[in-house]
Amino acid sequence: VGQCGDGLQVLRAVRQSRPDVVVLDITMPGLNGLDICRDLSRKCKFASVLILSMHDNEQFIARALEHGASGYLLKGAAAAQLTEAVAAVARGDLYLGPGISRSVLERLSNGEEDPYDRLTSRERQVLQLIAEGRTNRAIADELGLAVKTVDTHRMRLMRKLNIHDQTTLVKFALKKGLVSLQ
């Protein structure tokens, strides 16, 4: 059992401790839970992911499942439900908490493409840090990159998303749940 303060710590901790189940929130600093989930499903197949989130929104739920989550439970669920969810995910079962709608599964089956999915992992990291209000210099320092490289990632992700200004970029990140207003 472990606890991490941000998304980058989660990736390091999972690689070191090799847990069977990782319980993640979607809204996390540094790297959001959806991107962590995607990375874990590709690089740490030994760990199943259960998303425990306040986001009761079919878009978030569908994206979590698309990114490799094995379960999704809303915060505020009873302790027994959390125990049941962890056990189900540990067995390799899919777990969706009560009230998670059929429309989520329908959305998954119709294959809608999300422009966010076209971004590289690094572009997603840069987008999240921009949305958190970091400057190019601060992003460069945090990710160990040159400022010019951060600027290049910013330009590429804006082009891929067809976004032309900072305000719209931050709105996009909020809508995707990369950051919250709290």
Give names to the regions the model predicted.
Residues 25, 53:
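Active-site residues of response regulator receiver
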Residues 6-9, 32-35:
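Acidic catalytic/metal-coordinating carboxylates
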Residues 28:
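Receiver (REC) domain active-site loop signature in two-component systems and cognate sites
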Residues 15-17, 39-46, 67, 176:
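Conserved phosphotransfer cores of two-component systems
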Residues 59-66, 70-127, 167, 178-181:
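Short, flexible helix-to-coil linker/hinge segments that flank and couple to helix-turn-helix
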Residues 17-23:
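Active-site beta3 strand of CheY-like receiver
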Residues 135-168:
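Recognition helix of helix-turn-helix DNA-binding domains
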Residues 1-5, 13, 163:
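Short hydrophobic/Thr-rich beta-strand motif most characteristic of the beta2 strand and flanking loop
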